[in-house]
Amino acid sequence: MTEPSNRTPLYVALIVAVGLVLAGGAIGRGFSDARLSDRYVSVKGVAEREATADLALWPIPFVAADDDLTLAQARINETTKRIRAFLVAQGLDTSQAQLGSLRVTDRQANPYQAGEAGRRFIVRQVLILRSTEPAKVLAASQRIGELVQAGVVLSSGEEYGPGGPTFLFTKLNEIKPAMIAEATSRAREAAAQFARDAQSKLGGIRQANQGVFVILPRDQAPGVSEEGQLQKIVRVVATVDYYLR
């Protein structure tokens, strides 16, 4: 009868030990990979373009006053003709000019103003010019004093905005793809430089945010708005996270 070998427990112990070593190595590599995946750099890339407004909106408010409402209305009609003639003389197409709603104020209907001196009826009107020739609109707006010299009584008010024409850039979608590509490329350049400085290698993208497009005035100064300038700056900032290896 053959006796059981005493070597069997030794073999089992060796197998278990080797298994633990292999498992420990796998776990170690797992922790190493986890730490590596947590290493990343967040960078920003900026792209800018100078753009010229391609649309102008110019509200021209005016007013007439008289004790006779019919005469006040007649003055409004005459003023409308003068304004249109002025715009045509500046080389502008008035086919896109529209009249806003007519507003009439009867001062005698207001008990707080009934005793004040002045014309009874005040008629307000606004002519809104829409033009795809912003440069001509700007030039015409700088000669608005000629209308005053011709007897036109210009008005103002919060409903008409800050005064003067508004210049808009409407072709943003045409330049978006190229600007996003440029911003992303600059972000990658910054990340690559960081990786070199950190003696690491640049990995793939962890997360990306293209940012929001903003339109700014080209010449920034107190009291100067973007909508009041022909020349503008379009800017986008892309934020990208890259893994480091």
PLM regions with names:
Residues 2-245:
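Short, charged, surface-exposed interaction patches
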